[in-house]
Design a protein with these regions (language model features):
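Acidic-basic catalytic patches of nuclease active cores, encompassing PD-(D/E)XK
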Residues: 1-34
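Short beta-strand
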Residues: 34-36, 105
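Short acidic/glycine-enriched loop/turn segments that link adjacent beta-strands
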Residues: 38-41
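Catalytic cores of nucleic-acid endonucleases
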Residues: 60-117
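Short, low-complexity, polybasic intrinsically disordered segments
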Residues: 114-134
């Protein structure tokens, strides 16, 4: 049973990340990396737009009605991006910038994209929390 739930959460997470990537590309972002991992953490999406690097954490949840996302605000997906997770993300961001940026640390931003998935209607709704301070 636990294995089944873990598999479903993995599918939900991957689908949410794919939807978030498509959303970003439609808005002019260029996806540079996905699931950039280091032993202390991971960043779901790394994209660029207007000479700025955007680090994005994606949180996906299943809902019964994408039109009424406000109903699901009791448990917000972004609540899972707690201070310890932000600390780990900060370490990964610094490592990425050291590793990939030839001109040193440039302009960057960190965002959380919440993807609300309705598997019955096969629809999704996206909400973005931009420019979170690391």
């Amino acid at each position: 049973m636990r294995q089944k739930i873990k598999e479903l959460n993995t599918i939900k997470g991957r689908l949410g990340e794919q939807i978030a990537c498509e959303y970003l590309v439609k808005r002019g972002f260029i996806i540079k990396d996905r699931n950039y991992r280091k032993r202390w953490g991971e960043i779901d999406i790394i994209a660029t737009k207007d000479s700025k690097i955007h680090f994005i954490e994606v949180k996906s949840v299943s809902v019964s009605d994408c039109g009424q996302v406000e109903k699901y605000e009791k448990h917000k997906p972004e609540d899972n991006v707690h201070p310890y997770k932000i600390h780990k993300i900060r370490k990964v961001v610094v490592n990425y910038l050291d590793e990939k940026s030839s001109s040193g640390i440039g302009d960057f931003a960190f965002h959380v994209i919440c993807v609300y998935l309705n598997f019955v209607s096969r629809k999704a709704k996206i909400r973005i929390i931009e420019n979170i301070i690391l």
